[in-house]
Amino acid sequence: INLDDKEKSAQKIEYLKKLSLDIIKGVRTATFNLMPPELSDHGIVSSLAKLTQELSKLTGNEILFYNKTSFDKRLDSLVEINIYRLTQEAINNAIKYADSTHIIVQLSHSSTLLSVIIDDNGKGFDVSSVEKKRNSESGMGLLFMKERIQYINGRVFFNSIPGEGTRITFNIPI
């Protein structure tokens, strides 16, 4: 990049940004269906419990898991892997972007719906402004979550108040 030619430099930077986003999208697509052994062997409940324990140990943050309605069924493997990855992404975002120190993952169900709620005590964000930023890393993260949840016919809800934390809710038909 020749810094003397500002216009060409700006074009190259924009190209590199687009290339980086394309690479990120490619990596996410490549890992889309990778299955952790815990998930294939024991199902979503055990896997989420283990995920939260491991991330808590790794990061030093308090990350707790509650199976509020004693859900114990196995789901289709595509549904389980997507719930796992969505939860993993939400926890990682809470740590990476929100500076959260306390994260709670709650799983509950009814006869027709499985719900996973991730609450954090981080700095929160303005949901409407982030959703408009399709080319930023944070905007892309929310977009990928929406795409992944739609893939399993579910819905995602983002509730956040700047300075007060975030709640992400995934509802999946069962």
Which sequence ranges carry the predicted segments?
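Coiled-coil dimerization/phosphotransfer module
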Residues: 1-174
